[in-house]
């Protein structure tokens, strides 16, 4: 597939040493090192309690260094009156939100547009590290301490909501979503934004990344992985480099189709020629980079751009300062650039550390400035480079030099992330043709979105303690899954997750340290493992809707107790009452992108893979992205999932304030669908469970499901599993079509049928999905059971099942550190109503909805 070039017409950033692109270029060009220690109380616990630089320091509950790349001076340059939202609406939000909206505002204004003035349809794709922010940790701690007064509950939804706030603050109305592909996130975001432009579903896209995750969590986590620099120095490609140094901030680009940018006389900062994406699949492990995976991303980029590696005259490397990672990158590049010499390489991380989900976009801004200045800037701390470089095609830029080359300046930018996520972006300077009408390069132009129907050929559900066939039974007889617990609250709670040890490729000891969120999705996928194992490994993607797991905030609370309890034994006991210490396996088991990438390793799937966060629309947006990639021919199959275990104290507290009444019935769910192009599914002899028509226009007799007005809200039946809720509606629509029944249990036998899923989400986001069920057949319980129930495993006389709790034990804080407001009512403590915050997502209960021409019966309460 050829890549239609995309123009970069705007840029903005909020980064260490770079509160604007000009300031960032000055930092890079002048060779400044802007790393340092955090401001006082930045971590919520004194550094003396956490920093241990001794060689024998334990790997958990401590960090080897507090040095990082910190955003400084932001309050002096941020003006909340510059946005379409009232300044009060931005008050109380975590800095993550504010960095993102400010960097994106800069980018739009550099393109010549103020908020609300962007031409055509404009959207957002945001790379966002879905670890908790400090504000989310504060929120969770207050919930557990029973002191909820004054909480800004929006900080609970820090995975997808920042993109929604960006769209509202800037007047971008063509959809806003976030994703997590670890360190490759911002280049993944740029690629997916280009896809929107290519298929003409948007005219302008704002794309990039932000990292506002808890800096304490990153430092302790990277120490547990033995990846943090003990010296606090970021030294890419140095022979003595001892690890990475985390950084925070945001960086964004404004993108348009090149033809549109030229026609409108936009200032073109550069041109994206291609972005190649891949995953390592099984590779060497979730944390170990793979040459083969990195090479696939690079080769794909050059193939799509119709360029050769020798066209590149600068490489902005991923190079984080980890010896294995840097060497692997050099080795994979050496294969691609074999036979060439003297290729300049560098890394912005030597200046400001590793900004993780923002790093690729930050590198792109650096390269754009270098092209404009005609200067290749230096990389710091490379006085003793890795020996491999001496006989490689590459040379390190130790000082600034003129960027002279025979043709247009072209650069490659690498991003490689945990979980095997790889990205390679090709960037070209824009040279204005002497005659705009006759001297334009002959670039490929992609047509609007191809018209392939997409087939759903596999489905697996876990809802509470029910699996697919049981969920189908509940839908058929209108029997709710949520039931009342001892507190009188109705929940669809998952009490346990079980995995078959003969199926999993992960050591049981590691799985025991993995959060139930990851285990639930893995369990759902393993229930249809034979189907997934038959998919083409090189061209199958994994795209999963999810949100930040609030359980991860327990770690921050665990570490903060060190400032409250002096006695070591009492401190150890108190900490264990919150959560166990973080080991390397525990870090991986809580890593947000691993929710998707664990399936890459399990099934050796090597297509582009990532998690998607759009709050209630997370799973359906994952579905939409996978369908787009299938229609474009970039992949041949996709495993699409969504997971959320919402029966959890912190989420429930936030839901009571910000979500509608139906969405306050918490549910736990994991959903997995398998997609192919419909023609391929028929060729392969797959059973087509439903199709996603290309035109997405409903025809025939329609069943309306969802949370939009006029649709049937299934939360009373299935519970509300927040980030999984949208895809759960899709799965329910598939099941209703296969069962041949309406939700009231009456037969649905029309030849032309459709399911319309209409969804509303936080901050006004909306989405509609249309499904076409197969021709109706008589309901056959045995046939459906055989299709939906996992195949029986051979009996060996010994159980091969591993059982894991569906939730962590309740948080137990010592009485002397529990807040004085532990009995405060949730209702009394709401700082503002959901309506006042503009956050309520609409929806109506089953009893009041006419989801077809005539509603006959409604589910019974239980």
What residues fall within each predicted segment?
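Intrinsic, low-complexity polybasic segments
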Residues: 786-788, 812, 820-825
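Basic polycationic patches enriched in arginine
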Residues: 789, 793, 801, 812, ...
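Compositionally biased, low-complexity intrinsically disordered regions
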Residues: 806, 812-813, 819, 835, ...
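Polybasic, low-complexity intrinsically disordered segments
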Residues: 818-827, 854, 858
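Cationic, low-complexity basic patches in intrinsically disordered or flexible, solvent-exposed regions
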Residues: 831
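Long, low-complexity, intrinsically disordered segments
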Residues: 842, 846-862
């Amino acid at each position: 597939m050829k890549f239609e070039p995309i123009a970069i017409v705007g840029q903005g950033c909020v980064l260490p040493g770079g509160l604007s692109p000009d300031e960032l270029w000055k930092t890079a060009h002048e060779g400044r090192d802007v790393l340092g220690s955090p401001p006082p109380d930045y971590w919520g616990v004194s550094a003396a309690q956490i920093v241990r630089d001794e060689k024998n320091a334990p790997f958990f509950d401590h960090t080897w260094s507090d040095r990082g790349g910190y955003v400084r001076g932001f309050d002096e340059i941020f003006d909340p009156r510059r946005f379409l939202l009232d300044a009060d609406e931005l008050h109380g939000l975590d800095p993550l939100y504010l960095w993102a909206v400010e960097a994106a505002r800069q980018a739009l204004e550099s393109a010549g547009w103020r908020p609300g003035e962007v031409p055509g349809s404009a959207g957002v794709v945001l790379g966002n590290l879905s670890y908790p922010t400090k504000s989310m940790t504060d929120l969770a701690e207050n919930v557990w301490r029973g002191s909820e007064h004054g909480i800004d509950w929006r900080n609970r939804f820090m995975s997808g909501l920042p993109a929604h706030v960006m769209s509202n603050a800037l007047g971008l109305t063509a959809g806003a979503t976030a994703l997590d592909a670890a360190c490759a996130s911002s280049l993944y975001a740029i690629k997916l934004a280009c896809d929107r432009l290519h298929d003409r579903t948007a005219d302008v896209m704002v794309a990039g990344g932000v990292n506002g995750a808890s800096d304490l969590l990153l430092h302790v986590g990277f120490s547990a992985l033995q990846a943090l620099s003990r010296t606090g120095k970021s030294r890419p490609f140095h022979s003595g480099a001892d690890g990475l140094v985390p950084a925070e901030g945001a960086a964004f680009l404004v993108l348009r189709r090149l033809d549109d940018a030229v026609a409108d006389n936009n200032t073109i900062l550069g041109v994206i020629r291609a972005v190649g994406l891949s995953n390592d699949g099984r590779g060497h492990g979730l944390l170990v980079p793979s040459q083969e995976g990195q090479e696939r991303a690079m080769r794909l980029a050059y193939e799509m751009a119709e360029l050769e590696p020798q066209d590149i005259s600068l490489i902005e490397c991923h190079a984080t300062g980890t010896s294995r990672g840097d060497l692997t990158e050099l080795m994979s590049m050496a294969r691609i650039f074999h036979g060439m010499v003297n290729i300049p390489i560098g890394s912005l991380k030597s200046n400001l550390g590793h900004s993780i989900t923002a790093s690729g976009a930050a590198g792109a801004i650096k390269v754009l400035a270098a092209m404009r200045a005609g200067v290749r800037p230096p990389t710091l701390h490379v006085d003793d480079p890795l020996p491999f470089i001496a006989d490689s095609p590459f040379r390190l830029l130790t000082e600034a030099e003129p960027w002279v080359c025979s043709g247009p300046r072209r650069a490659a930018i690498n991003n490689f992330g945990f979980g095997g996520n790889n990205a390679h972006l090709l960037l070209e300077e824009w040279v204005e043709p002497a005659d705009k009408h006759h001297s334009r390069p002959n670039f490929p132009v992609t047509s609007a979105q191809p018209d392939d129907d997409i087939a759903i050929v596999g489905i697996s559900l876990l809802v509470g303690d029910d699996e697919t066939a049981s969920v189908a039974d509940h839908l058929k007889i209108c029997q709710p899954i949520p039931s009342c617990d001892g507190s009188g609250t109705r929940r669809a709670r998952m009490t346990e997750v079980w995995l078959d040890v003969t199926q999993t490729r992960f050591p049981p000891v590691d799985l025991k340290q993995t959060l139930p969120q990851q285990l639930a999705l893995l369990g759902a996928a393993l229930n249809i493992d034979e189907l997934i194992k038959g998919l083409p490994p090189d061209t199958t993607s994994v795209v999963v809707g999810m949100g930040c797991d609030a359980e991860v905030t327990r770690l921050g609370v665990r570490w903060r107790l060190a400032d409250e309890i002096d006695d070591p034994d009492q401190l150890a006991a108190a900490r264990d009452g919150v959560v166990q210490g973080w080991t390397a396996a525990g870090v991986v088991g809580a890593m947000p992108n691993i929710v998707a990438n664990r399936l890459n390793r399990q099934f050796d799937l090597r297509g582009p893979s990532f998690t998607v966060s759009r709050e209630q629309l997370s799973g359906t947006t994952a579905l939409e992205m996978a369908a787009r990639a299938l229609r474009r021919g970039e992949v041949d199959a996709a495993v699409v999932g969504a997971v959320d275990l919402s029966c959890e104290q912190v989420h429930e507290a936030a839901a009571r304030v910000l979500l509608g009444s139906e969405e306050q019935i918490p549910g736990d769910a994991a959903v997995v669908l398998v997609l192919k192009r419909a023609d391929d599914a028929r060729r392969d002899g797959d059973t087509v469970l439903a199709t996603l028509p290309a035109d997405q226009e409903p025809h025939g007799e329609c069943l309306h499901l969802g949370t939009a007005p006029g649709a049937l809200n299934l939360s009373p039946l299935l519970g509300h599993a927040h980030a999984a809720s949208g895809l759960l509606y899709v799965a329910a629509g598939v099941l209703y079509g296969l069962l041949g029944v309406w939700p009231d249990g009456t037969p649905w036998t029309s030849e032309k049928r459709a399911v319309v899923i209409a969804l509303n989400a936080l901050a006004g986001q909306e989405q509609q999905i249309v499904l076409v069920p197969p021709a109706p057949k008589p309901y056959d319980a045995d046939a459906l059971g055989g299709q939906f129930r996992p195949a029986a495993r051979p009996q060996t006389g010994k159980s091969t099942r591993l059982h894991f709790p569906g939730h962590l034990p309740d948080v137990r804080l010592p009485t002397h550190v529990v807040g004085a407001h532990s009995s405060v009512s949730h209702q009394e403590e709401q700082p503002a109503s959901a309506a006042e915050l503009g956050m309520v997502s609409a929806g109506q209960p089953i009893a009041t909805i006419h989801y077809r021409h005539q509603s006959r019966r409604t589910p019974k309460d239980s």
